[in-house]
Amino acid sequence: MKTFAVFGDPIAHSVSPRLHNKAIADLALDALYTRVLLKDGNELINKFRFLKLNGANVTLPHKEFALNLADDASETAQKIGSANTLVLKNEKIYAYNTDAPGFLKAIANFKEAKSAIILGAGGTANALAYALKSQNIDVCILNRSKARLDKFKDHYECFSW
């Protein structure tokens, strides 16, 4: 049986196990998906290995730990600066960020865009900004607090209110 999990803090609210286990059942796969409350992001990889997971999703506040502690990381995850997916391959743990490619797939049928506004400067904003910029789309990020825009201001147009 393959075992998968989602790591986060808090995590009790996550519907990921319900969604993934429904898909697993519908596809008649020999697998299980669960959630893991992880207080200390430094323990992410140790917990992954201890639980003998085949893969995991990672949510707040551990995405940077996922990137920095994995054995290897995709170019996309490295450029974004965080990972939301861990995969075990040949005893090594690989980190990926699926937010950017997933977002691009979701907007693939949209009319050709020249510019986009991202509302909010949270964790996913960096992935979306990276994805849009990779498609030569001008990005503007709007956020209530100016401080959260600091990491974006060198690469994107930013405004706060």
Regions found by a protein language model. Name each.
Residues 2-109:
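Phosphate/diphosphate ligand-binding glycine-rich loop within oxidoreductases
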Residues 135-155:
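NAD(P)-binding Rossmann-fold cofactor-contacting core
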